[in-house]
C-alpha cells in the first residue's frame, strides 16, 4: 500500500511539474457554446460542435481528412491538451499537427505530429521527414519512387508506441514540444517521446486536429506556451 501511495505521489508531482512548464494559455475551448468560435479554421472539414463537444467528421468522398485548426503567433515549445474518444470502429485515427504555414520547405508547412489510433501512437518529424520538399523528396514519396537510402532515412523520422484505448471511453491526451523533442501522455501516463531536428522548429504557428474519418469526439481543447520573459 505504501509503495502504491508513493508511486501515485510521484506521478502527481510529475504532472504538476509538466503543467508548470507551460503556464501560459494561448487558446482554449470547452465547446460549451455549441458552435465553432471565430478563431477556428477548417480545411475539407465537416466537423461540428454539438452537445458540448467537437465531433470530427471527414465528408464522404473527400480526398483529405477533416482539418480543424487554430492559428497563433509562432512559438517553439508548446503543449496541446484535448479530451477525446473513439466512438466506433469507423474511427481510424486522429492527428495533432504542429505547422508553420510561412515555412515553404515542407508540404503545407507541416512540422511534426502525433497520430493516435486505438492501438498505436506515432510521433513524427514532418519537416525533415516525409513532408520535406528538399530535392523532390516529398514528391518521390507520393509517387512511390524513393530509393532504399531515402526509405531508411525516413524510418528514422518517426517512432511508434503501442496503446490500448477502448471505444467510447474518454481519454485526455497531452502533446508537448520542447526543443527537438515531442512527448505524449494519455490519462496522465507517459506514452513515449521522440527526438528529431525538425521538431525544434522555432515558429510553430498553427495546431490542427485532423480526423480520419469519422466518430472521433473532442472536448476541453487547449494550447499552452512556456512563460515569456
PLM region spans:
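Short tryptophan-centered beta-strand motifs in secreted/extracellular beta-sheet-rich domains
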Residues: 31, 80-82, 169-184
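Beta-strand-rich interaction surfaces with strong enrichment in secreted/lumenal proteins
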Residues: 66-72, 159-165, 207-208
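Extracellular carbohydrate-recognition regions
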Residues: 20-42
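Short, aromatic/His-centered strand-loop micro-motif at the edge of beta-sheets
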Residues: 134-172
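Short, solvent-exposed beta-strand-to-loop segments that form ligand-recognition rims
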Residues: 187-204
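Secretory/extracellular carbohydrate-interaction modules
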Residues: 60-141
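Ligand-recognition surfaces built from glycine- and aromatic
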Residues: 199-229
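Short carbohydrate-recognition loop motifs
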Residues: 46-64
Amino acid at each position: 500500500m505504501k509503495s502504491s501511495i508513493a508511486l501515485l505521489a510521484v506521478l502527481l508531482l510529475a504532472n504538476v511539474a509538466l503543467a508548470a512548464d507551460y503556464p501560459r494559455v494561448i487558446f482554449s475551448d470547452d465547446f460549451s457554446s455549441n458552435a465553432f468560435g471565430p478563431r477556428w479554421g477548417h480545411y475539407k472539414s465537416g466537423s461540428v460542435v454539438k452537445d458540448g463537444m467537437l465531433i470530427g467528421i471527414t465528408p464522404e468522398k473527400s480526398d483529405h481528412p477533416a482539418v480543424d485548426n487554430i492559428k497563433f503567433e509562432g512559438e517553439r515549445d508548446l503543449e496541446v491538451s484535448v479530451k477525446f474518444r473513439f466512438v466506433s470502429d469507423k474511427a481510424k485515427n486522429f492527428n495533432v499537427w504542429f505547422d508553420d504555414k510561412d515555412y515553404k520547405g515542407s508540404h503545407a508547412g507541416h512540422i511534426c505530429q502525433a497520430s493516435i489510433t486505438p492501438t498505436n501512437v506515432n510521433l513524427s518529424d514532418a519537416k525533415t521527414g516525409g513532408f520535406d520538399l528538399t530535392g523532390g523528396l516529398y514528391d518521390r514519396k507520393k509517387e512511390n519512387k524513393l530509393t532504399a537510402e531515402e526509405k531508411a532515412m525516413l524510418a528514422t523520422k518517426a517512432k511508434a508506441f503501442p496503446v490500448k484505448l477502448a471505444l467510447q471511453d474518454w481519454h485526455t491526451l497531452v502533446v508537448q514540444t520542447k526543443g527537438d523533442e515531442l512527448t505524449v501522455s494519455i490519462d496522465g501516463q507517459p506514452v513515449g517521446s521522440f527526438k528529431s531536428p525538425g521538431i525544434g522548429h522555432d515558429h510553430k504557428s498553427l495546431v490542427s486536429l485532423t480526423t480520419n474519418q469519422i466518430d472521433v469526439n473532442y472536448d476541453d481543447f487547449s494550447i499552452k506556451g512556456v512563460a515569456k520573459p
